[in-house]
Amino acid sequence: MANQNTHHNLYSSYNQLPEPLFMTIHFLAANEPLIVDGKPRLGYFDDALPIINTSDFVYDNPFGQARSDFQKWLGNKEFQYFGGMSDRLIFGCAIANLRYVAIAFVYVYDIKAQKLWSHSWRSPLGLGFDLANNSRQGETHFRIPAIVDIHLRYQDNPREKTLMIKCKGLDIEVRMDEQGLQPMSICTRTGYSGWTYTAKSAGQPLYGFVKLNDEHIDLQQIKAYGSLDFSTGYMRRETWWNWACSAGEIQAGARKGQRAGLNLSTGVNETSFSENCFWLNGQCYPLNHAQFKFDIKDTLQPWQITADNGQLQLQFQPMGMHREKVRAGFLNTHFRQMFGEFQGCIVLNGEEICLDGLKGFVEDQYIKW
């Protein structure tokens, strides 16, 4: 673990980060639909969008010819992710709509016991599956009778997210309060004809419990923090990304005890805009391009992550991994999400903030869908 002097030497030569996100970026109004005159509005929004009218999108091919209704239906991909992290445990839950199949996974890693509970499910053609079409108000439901029931609920007033999971050996009920949080809300062009919209939030405390194999863990008592990823759009048929996310209380320095959240990615936002950002006490600060260095053949080795010309420098030490690997003709995916601990700093308006000890995730994803 590097000491404060080492961190200071690393960052002393870099410029300050910009002012808070809402002061430096021109925002589009979130209270208007995403699709206007058949085209998506591209850029940053001042809030998560309540109207994602995908059906109004005109999905032409590169030669200006309209694609069929089936191609339009098949081309739209959606996924939602809810994560929780603390010094006691780390958990993640993802639900994805690939049209011809719906996929869900849940894992819980007990840091104290160093044990991983993990399971994934697939539902052909999305049977027993409903997906909220925005992250402000709605419900996502993945259910296989007598096997698993996952319920993700978005509520606008008061602004909060709730996740309930019931399956053999695992019972989760968790709520993340997002009042006072500025989400990252952005839409970018993807490929020639497509687009990707995402709303992300991190760094908010969690309430509720995780019951794993009859052990009941109160999330407020262990100071668990959460993250939410809502993504939809017309993404590339073959694509990839790396992603990092963290949330929790700062553990050292002048900001000790304050709330922090982090979202970093590469390979997702192709042009003009970046979803990379840092949250401090609910306030969102922009970050530019991020770089991920890791051993692609052994992703459990340490990762190095930098952003904003080095104003953010992190090392991530994985504790374990959830993996999905499918080679099935039309669908090919190699997904690896590592969970573990970050070390490093960010320089924010000239102030060095230590992020040592924060828990979170990194991800390496290849998919052809």
Predicted regions and their residues:
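Structured soluble/peripheral alpha/beta segments that form catalytic or ligand/cofactor-binding pockets
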Residues: 20-369
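N-terminal amphipathic/basic-hydrophobic helices that include classical n-h-c signal peptides
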Residues: 1-22
